[in-house]
Amino acid sequence: MSGEPGTDIAEVIRSLMREVPDFPEPGVHFKDLTPVLADAYGLAEVSRAIADSARGADLVAGVDARGFLLGGAVAVTLGIGVLAVRKGGKLPPPVLGETYTLEYGSATLEVPADGVELAGRSVVVIDDVLATGGTLAAAHQLLTKAGANVTGAVVMMELTALGGRAAVDPLEVTSLYSV
């Protein structure tokens, strides 16, 4: 663990993340956040920083899959619930879904259509990375369709060169670390 108490959250993330050249293909410089989440101090600091941005929410919505880890930790910190925004086909019916476009195809996000009342609730969406913005935009649209008031989103890392903020505009996004 290389973070020190009082260290800037971006520095904590940068110091703990692993950089993997040429993954998943040549020329890509992959930023692996797994070591940040596996480090007790790193997880605690990231969770606290996200919780600070999500204060006032009735519910946090963690996006499949690492958003689940972050969302759960943040919900406990804030004393509120967490909703798992799942990849398609993982929840029993009935579900509400939102399909979005990927580079080579499409994907779907889902939430329960009943059993969890979302109408009128103030929700902050939590995910690990903002890249092109497709997943975050779909989560926002899905939760809005379910009647939630999505007040913002928080991501651990933003890949600014991929322009994800434009895809989620006008949703307010807080990023703890940008590259």
Swiss-Prot record:
Chemical reaction(s) catalysed: AMP + diphosphate = 5-phospho-alpha-D-ribose 1-diphosphate + adenine
Xref: InterPro entries: Ade_phspho_trans, PRibTrfase_dom, PRTase-like, UPRTase/APRTase
Functional pathway: Purine metabolism; AMP biosynthesis via salvage pathway; AMP from adenine: step 1/1
PROSITE patterns per the UniProt record, alphabetical: PUR_PYR_PR_TRANSFER
One function term, GO molecular function aspect: adenine phosphoribosyltransferase activity
EC number: 2.4.2.7
Source superkingdom: Bacteria
Gene Ontology CC: cytoplasm
Enzyme type, top EC level: transferase
Principal location class: cytoplasm
Keywords: Cytoplasm, Glycosyltransferase, Purine salvage, Transferase
Keyword Transferase: yes
GO biological process assignments: adenine salvage; AMP salvage; purine ribonucleoside salvage
Localisation per UniProt entry: Cytoplasm
SUPFAM superfamilies to which the protein is assigned, alphabetical: PRTase-like
PANTHER family (UniProt xref): ADENINE PHOSPHORIBOSYLTRANSFERASE
Assembly with partners or alone: Homodimer.
Role played: Catalyzes a salvage reaction resulting in the formation of AMP, that is energically less costly than de novo synthesis.
Family according to the record: Belongs to the purine/pyrimidine phosphoribosyltransferase family.
The protein, known as: Adenine phosphoribosyltransferase
Organism of this sequence: Mycolicibacterium gilvum (strain PYR-GCK)
